[in-house]
Amino acid sequence: MKSEDPHPALATGQAPAEALGFMGFWADIDADYELRYQEWHNCEHMPERVGIPGFIEGRRYRALLGSPRFFMCYVTDGPEVLGSPAYLAALNRPTPWTSESLTHFRNPVRSLYRNHCRVGRAGGYAPYILQRRFDHKADAATLAGMVRAVVAEDTSGTLSGGLYEVDEAISGIMTAERRIYSGGPGRQQYLFTIEALDRDQAEAAGRRLDALMAEGASEINPGLYWLENRIQSAELRRPVAAPVAAAADTRFPERLTP
């Protein structure tokens, strides 16, 4: 039986422009902490975050081209979820494991976005995501037309694209977690994403997108990442709200022994 994405906007790619919120977090991780970081992110952090009301899914990617080395993201029911009391409670009460892990983040960039456009049917399990963080002289409607044009050229039905714009107000909120990793939002106003089942397909779409956006673009930060993990709220047995996230203190695991 063909599996379906439990959230209609992700399944069909036809979400209204403002229907989804998106958090993007780019960071390098200390080399001697990477395994520990992946364990934390898989086993505690993503399940905790995706259990917060309004969160749809979380993902983590590793860089193939560009930097930083890791890209973490969350999709929410709307941008307002990223400034909700439940989410802010989690950000201001990190677990011991989170507090430890965040000290190993380097070159962190965390931006909160509102969605202008999401088209195509590749879905969140597509193994490759190509990104362009950038500024542009054109307005959001014109930029959305560019990503729609690139996806429309694909005849395989296995390509998705999105345009996101930074929400400066909620991106700038200071929290306990942010004080630990000492980072903030990126400089660029916009984010293009192309999700694909094939690396060559993603890179070809990126070249078409680059040609369309070339005139008027500045501060371009490119990247190509492959998917390491994805968790959806529908997959959690007992999702928890942020106010009880501190219960993770009692299950703080021992360190891994290589």
Region locations from a protein language model:
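Macromolecular interaction modules
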Residues: 2-258
